[in-house]
Amino acid sequence: MSSFEGQMAEYPTISIDRFDRENLRARAYFLSHCHKDHMKGLRAPTLKRRLECSLKVYLYCSPVTKELLLTSPKYRFWKKRIISIEIETPTQISLVDEASGEKEEIVVTLLPAGHCPGSVMFLFQGNNGTVLYTGDFRLAQGEAARMELLHSGGRIKDIQSVYLDTTFCDPRFYQIPSREECLSGILELVRSWITRSPYHVVWLNCKAAYGYEYLFTNLSEELGVQVHVNKLDMFRNMPEILHHLTTDRNTQIHACRHPKAEEYFQWSKLPCGITSRNRIPLHIISIKPSTMWFGERSRKTNVIVRTGESSYRACFSFHSSYSEIKDFLSYLCPVNAYPNVIPVGTTMDKVVEILKPLCRSSQSMEPKYKPLGKLKRARTVHRDSEEEDDYLFDDPLPIPLRHKVPYQETLHPEVFSMTVVSEKQPEKLRQTPGCCRAESMQSSRFTNFVDCEESNSESEEEVGIPASLQGDLGSVLHLQKADGDVPQWKVFFKRNDEITDERLENFPSSTEAGGSQSPKLFSDSDGESTHISSQNSSQSTHITEQGSQGWDSQSDTVLLSSQERNSGDITSLDKVDYRPTIKENIPASLMEQNVICPKHTYSDLKSRDQDVTVVPSTGEPTTLSSETHIPEEKSLLNLSTNADSQSSSDFEVPSTPEAELPKREHLQYLYEKLATGESIAVKKRKCSLSDI
């Protein structure tokens, strides 16, 4: 029995399935189906007077419900006030207050409820949100997902409230057999009985006037026997039902009902009192469709249960089971859910407790963040010294990290970049990655640190920057870019280096150029790059390697002492090709300045006491000495040689006197280390140009 009071909180100006008390002031009425518990007050005198005093109050229902309602003379006064709405057709309705003229627009959509002929659900859409009233319904699991009008844009509509049929919202009725299963069980029982003889009759003991039409029509169609009913007036406009029913009592299947006074014919078990014409007694069995009786059973039973000598119970339900209700509500996931029926043996609070977890209002509205999985994160390690690197990865590196210190843009006047470029080189070759580039470049990832192995003496820090260099340094420091392209493997063994000499006036320092550009045998994180802080001079020499792809490593830098620079004794290198050679005997005075050499160039060639000096590759004598004087307008030089011992072109040039050619076994040992990616130890020494 429905306990719905007729009004919804979202749209209180309309009344549904209730037509008395406060509902008399409604602007519109809605009827879901023609069962008496949903028609309270529909033919009351007070409602009749309301209709007589109003011109814009109507009753909305489905076309089948309208036909069923008007077949009864008691409801014919509604004939001019009933408006039928087609199922699954959104219809706009104006709710007008005749006293104040206030108007409200809503859209109503009728959805099939599966309860009885003409039963529908009402979907209301308006300014107060979307609300669904189910009335009495029976929908199988997953059937709501197939209703297109419950969806919008491929997803379920945002429903504010659902007024739900909770007749069997009780765990006792967790699973109710479907109508097809119930029909199959009843059909087999009826067939087995009526086929015995013409005197075997079945009585379907149905208490409701509407709702069993599904059972009647299917039995008649399968067995070819019409079902006897008391009257056919309500089905006269429904030929699909009328064809399977009859008022002739001479049939083997009866669904007739007892009179109101519950009078029984003593000579017959059938309500209609039919007997055989030749006085042969009839063999009658009764089948009572029921659901509540099966819900009270303590153990699972069959669809058909024999309760007496000639009586049976058949499980047949007009309402959704407990599992079907939960499936329907969890799919819609409304904000609120209100029960329309209090199940037998329970209370309203228990029903609300069951429905509440299925609504959005009980769920946390805060977004729940879930991890994407186990991700690699940087590990924080506290260091005592600021000079140590932070390990960004969990796994140790394949080789030990070299200690680095943060790079600071401090100008050191003693360090200059010397580049040798021949004047015979085309203009395009001068703009190689090792040369100055005019466009602004982004700093390399290696430019933030310099190796701790590089030492700056106290004398270098105390010497100031000449005034003549102040103007050039500011404009040059922004014209440099680190070229860290990864070299191809063939670069290690096939190279033709053309080393030339040319005076360039404005050349960027090696520090701003992005540090060492030596081949990366490991990863970018191996920490083996070397950065030299230097300054630019008006005259510098740069070694250009034609065809270099990522082998633009910075070569040895010969640092001039402050005494030699102040006295103006500068070595002049004019149009002469240079290449590195090995020299065993180096004066002690040569160790006063740093000679920074690439780590992959000359390690393990002779011994750790060997170093690199620059000698002419031709027969022209060129010396680096403090007695050599040049004009004072010449700027300081920063000698930078690209010692590439892996290039085969180094040994095709005629040897310089007093130069010692590398031995084959030394080169083989060096190449094997480079090929396997092993690090080459470099021992750096301080030297002075005056000792050369």
Curated annotation (Swiss-Prot):
GO cellular-component term (any): nonhomologous end joining complex
SUPFAM superfamilies documented for this protein: Metallo-hydrolase/oxidoreductase
PANTHER family: DNA CROSS-LINK REPAIR PROTEIN PSO2/SNM1-RELATED, PROTEIN ARTEMIS
Keywords: Adaptive immunity, DNA damage, DNA recombination, DNA repair, Endonuclease, Exonuclease, Hydrolase, Immunity, Magnesium, Nuclease, Nucleus, Phosphoprotein
EC number: 3.1.-.-
GO biological process: adaptive immune response; DNA recombination; double-strand break repair via nonhomologous end joining; interstrand cross-link repair; telomere maintenance
Description of how the protein assembles with itself and partners: Interacts with LIG4; the interaction is direct. Interacts with ATM. Interacts with BRCA1. Interacts with PRKDC. Interacts with TP53BP1. Also exhibits ATM- and phosphorylation-dependent interaction with the MRN complex, composed of MRE11, RAD50, and NBN.
Ranges where the record places region Disordered: 503-555, 640-660
Location in the cell: Nucleus
Annotated signal peptide: none
Post-translational note: Phosphorylation on undefined residues by PRKDC may stimulate endonucleolytic activity on 5' and 3' hairpins and overhangs. PRKDC must remain present, even after phosphorylation, for efficient hairpin opening. Also phosphorylated by ATM in response to ionizing radiation (IR) and by ATR in response to ultraviolet (UV) radiation.
Biased composition (Low complexity): 530-543
Sequence similarity: Belongs to the DNA repair metallo-beta-lactamase (DRMBL) family.
Lineage: Eukaryota, Metazoa, Chordata, Craniata, Vertebrata
Stated name of the protein: Protein artemis
GO molecular function, one term: endonuclease activity
InterPro entries named among the record's database cross-references: DRMBL, RibonucZ/Hydroxyglut_hydro
Enzyme class: hydrolase
